[in-house]
Amino acid sequence: MKLKVLNAFGVGILVSAACNFTNGQSIEDVVLNVYKEPTCGCCNGWIEHMNDNGYSTAFHHPTNIQKLKDEFGLKNEWRSCHTAVHKDGYYFEGHIPEKFIAQFLSAPPKGAMGLSVPGMPIGGPGMEMGNRFTPYDILLINKDGSHSIFASIKKASEQH
């Protein structure tokens, strides 16, 4: 009897864990785990941008997102509103256009930790506001704590 109860309890935990993933995905299907505040609409816009470009995503609402970013090793100067963690362990911080994530993933630079768009530039994926656009840089962040410019986005059309 105890074994049946324990098995039922274990199955319940697995079913509950599976329900945390969006669109009925299994754990193996998730390519990006996105950590964000529950009320952030621009993060949802970025997730939609990634899904529209063929990525599978799951989102999570940690109790303390800043502490989580500290644990990931993301410096304050690199931060934005959400952090995506790729299944291969790379970090994508903020409103990075999908085409630059694909470029990065096709040949990750040695020692790279990921990419970042610090802040929340107007006109980036998820931050659309009509025809308004603020130029921004995409940073290559490295495991040694350094960073460099991966790409400079001067106009909205360069994001696609």
What spans do the regions from the language model cover?
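Bacterial N-terminal signal peptides that target proteins for export
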Residues: M1-F9
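Bacterial N-terminal signal peptides
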Residues: A8-A17
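N-terminal, post-signal-peptide region of Sec/Tat-exported proteins
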Residues: N44-G89, G94
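Thiol/selenol-based redox catalytic cores and closely related redox-interacting motifs
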Residues: E71, E77-H160
